[in-house]
Amino acid sequence: AERVWQEFVKALAAPQPHRFFEVLRSCHGLSDWLPECQAMPLNQLARHRPEPLERFALLPLSADDVQALAERLLAPKAFLQAAVDRMSYLLLLSDWPQVDGAALFQAVEQLKALHDSRRLVLIMQLMDSPTLRHRLERELLPLLAELKNLALPADRAATLKGAAYGEALTEIRVQYLNERLAAL
């Protein structure tokens, strides 16, 4: 599995990654190790992306197929995570700034972007539109810092503990997001 993964990553890094799949498809070489790739539309491979991680994340496969492929080839967790994140959140971010604050906050939380924005930034890098990507960099990334700095008023914070505190903080963050999104 490790050797097949190494060759797979080399193919993803190649100038023409589709050739790897074409050759294996022509000799029925995909069936054992890469069966999910047999029906994959090769014209949809992300040729304009040089990084194997980005190309893997953009493979035109279903979530189940990506999961099975990653497990079989013992792919590094970052590759599977990038693909799952893309499938889960790219569409939401593509609607920027006409997104629902609650949905956006849920995505930010699940990506743990208030603590480390790398996963969110990778999704943004996977966008086809440089204009939208730059807009998100200008608007969403600073908004994360603002969200992180939001706090409950002291009198309200003093009366809440545990899950109730977290729910109240989420509520003010979602409200803040909705207000900011409406102003964009």
Residue ranges and their predicted role:
Residues 113-184:
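Charged substrate- and nucleic-acid-binding regions of tRNA-handling and nucleotidyl-transfer enzymes
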Residues 1-133:
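Conserved, hydrophobic alpha-helical core segments of structured domains
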